[in-house]
């Protein structure tokens, strides 16, 4: 029998994944086939030839890249200088192409910059900050095999009566909890039973936890608090073809939005999107999942293309679980910085994730060995019409005049979904013809649950578990938070001269006898001078609007052109600031931040997130208190929600969503969608 090495097994697994995902995507699905062998825009992601060239250059720089002792953890375009990108026009020569690589070699973190034209490594920073790069699939697969090498672990499993054939140990978590965990990459894992179910997340093997040295692949510590009943597999199935339950619900007929003339948007050169009055660049990203760049909107009155946002993306996704017990205290995930939203993305499912007439974009990332890996159907673009109204008015006070004006609201959605372990997240960037950009994050998938001996709340008595409610027999849904920090480099009619304005709604009391009213609201505006002026904690009883304006671009009435942030889901972190997870997730100390533009400040939790200590976070940058008035500035908003689980979240959660908007404020001279055409029956298909 031929024995395969771990590396051969990994390559085989990746090859099978490639084959599966390629076959899973419909041949009729409009998609970008990656036939391009060269980039067309300064912000285009690395092409497959470029990824291969980077691997060749790195092998020459460090023989370890060829032997496998040096591992690539992330590779992406090192974007050109912002002003150079802004000045670039189609037909111009592209700026020099560079790649940024996060790698590990001999236990040290490397941040390398490679010049693709010269073939040189122009920078190699070793351990620039405390922490390690994003995990690789190779890391996760290797760690999942470590428990079986331990006699102590195997005895613990046997004592619990769990068959090894039904065992799976693939949910890693780390964090940072003191100096005893420093100096090496540490990971903590818990195992589950997949016997009689694919939903192993609902069958945790509670009370048994392992700490592993990732580089030596050795167990550092085993904690065995004694057996806890493993929840039964009954009721854990969620796949449509395997559900045997009777559903007492009237069938809803299939539906889709028909477009007889095809979609209204265009995708040029793979990544440049044009729709209605919008134009923007979109690309897959290993860490952020999806990046929107150079979003411009055309003024419907003048035809001028005006800049709105240079770059927007999900910077970090922080999920702290609220159980301080052994084995649980470190389950506080930084999904973007520790796992990556790009590699966690799975192919979007046509007709269910994205509607008919959607257009799909693939992603390409580098494997630990520097080999291009395909992420098919990673992003989809589609037009949405859900029966909403863009604007309307009917008039009844003019005799003999029949006025019933209404316009349908059609939007363009860019969507990416990722499955980061048990949780699934759907990210939407939705562009509206009135200039609004709405960003929505939806969550589904499986809860992170805890095993318990109790099957009914009556069994608990006064021993109710503080970590969460009972959601099924022997299953506790652990309370947790979701915080998604967005990096929003807003460039309102230019990049070098924006300001952040806090518009305060202040209650004014009237003296007796002046009016029959006793109070009213008055608006006062405050221009933030420095970064600390723009550290905002939301409060319902101290309301503000938050505007980004260009004081040098005035409307005909003298108002500065601007956009405002319309917050949606707001939740404050209740953790102490010196709690280790909160130190790393310090960007949740406020809901809104504004910083001076710095191309190195992109990741709210820091560049090297894994086992970081909170020394390179948005909080640290903002506390430098740089001037932000009439400067190139970046808006940061953290969308958040607390999640107290319930029975409806079992075995898989119905999708919950939260959003925020970026909305024009005196940006246009009047309603920009006044002149859009209504729909008429004659223009629609008869189905």
Curated annotation (Swiss-Prot):
Amino acids binding Cu cation: 480, 482, 643
GO cellular component, one term: apoplast
Annotated organism of origin: Arabidopsis thaliana (Mouse-ear cress)
Residue spans crossing the bilayer: none
Cofactor: how bound: Binds 1 copper ion per subunit. Can also use zinc ion as cofactor.
Listed name of the protein: Amine oxidase [copper-containing] gamma 2
Signal peptide: 1-24
Residue numbers binding Mn(2+): 489-491, 632-633
